[in-house]
UniProtKB/Swiss-Prot annotation:
One GO term of the biological process aspect: protein modification process
GO molecular function: lipoyl(octanoyl) transferase activity
Known function: Catalyzes the transfer of endogenously produced octanoic acid from octanoyl-acyl-carrier-protein onto the lipoyl domains of lipoate-dependent enzymes. Lipoyl-ACP can also act as a substrate although octanoyl-ACP is likely to be the physiological substrate.
Other comment: In the reaction, the free carboxyl group of octanoic acid is attached via an amide linkage to the epsilon-amino group of a specific lysine residue of lipoyl domains of lipoate-dependent enzymes.
Region (Disordered): 137-174
E.C. code: 2.3.1.181
Cited InterPro entries: aa-tRNA-synth_II/BPL/LPL, BPL_LPL_catalytic, Octanoyltransferase, Octanoyltransferase_CS
Enzyme class: transferase
Protein name: Octanoyltransferase
Catalytic activity: octanoyl-[ACP] + L-lysyl-[protein] = N(6)-octanoyl-L-lysyl-[protein] + holo-[ACP] + H(+)
Gene name for this UniProt entry: lipB
Keyword match Nucleotidyltransferase: no
Subcellular location field: Cytoplasm
Lineage, highest ranks first: Bacteria, Pseudomonadati, Pseudomonadota, Betaproteobacteria, Burkholderiales
Amino acid sequence: MNMEIRHLGRVDYLPTYEAMQAFTLERTAATPNSLWICEHPPVYTQGLAGKIEHVLNPGDIPVVQTNRGGQVTYHGPGQVVAYPLIDLKQAGYYVKEYVYRIEEAVIRTLSHFGVTGHRVPGAPGIYVRLDDPFSHARLRPSPQPSPKGRGSSTPVLLPPLPGEGGGGGGPDPDPFHSLGKIAALGIKVSRHCTYHGVALNVAMDLEPFSRINPCGYAGLKTVDLRTIGVSVTWQEAADVLGQKLSSYLAP
């Protein structure tokens, strides 16, 4: 499966969204898969599950309704945004595995810079430990209310196993208190073809995240590589993420 990587630079969100839709609508079985890598001026985007009450105080930052999955997120300068435009039928895997592969590419990108990324069941995206983002400490799922009030698995940091210097852990009343979100994911699949994608925070002004409930979670902390002590340029992060996505999305 060949994949063309296109570096778009800094581009407005809405025309990029419209271009993704057009690309997907017009593509045929002969259309090569493509990976668009870009950066957006400040914008909030709402997913299909988004609720207006999660947009707390947008101010002068526009809010764009989209057809991707998920809830509200923020895009802005200093964030690498990657849009894989993939024919899953050609790729030979289904949506669940597609999401897993995107997350794995982000985890491997973070690992390249010495950071340990974590998945959180029921909360798509990638998270890091705020107390030690370079630690390999495990996370254990624990049933907690989801943003919609249903049960879901959210993380509790595990101390060492017996014999490793510690005891067991219990449910945390604030399961995200020790975690920060460093990458957000939201996709759309139309006629087995994907668009939208993933955003990795590199060196941003993080203040706009405080004006929303990111991904529908009130108080969820958002971090970037700079905040956790990793000095890397946008282009360096974009190049590594592009390479990892190209590799992990291959059949």
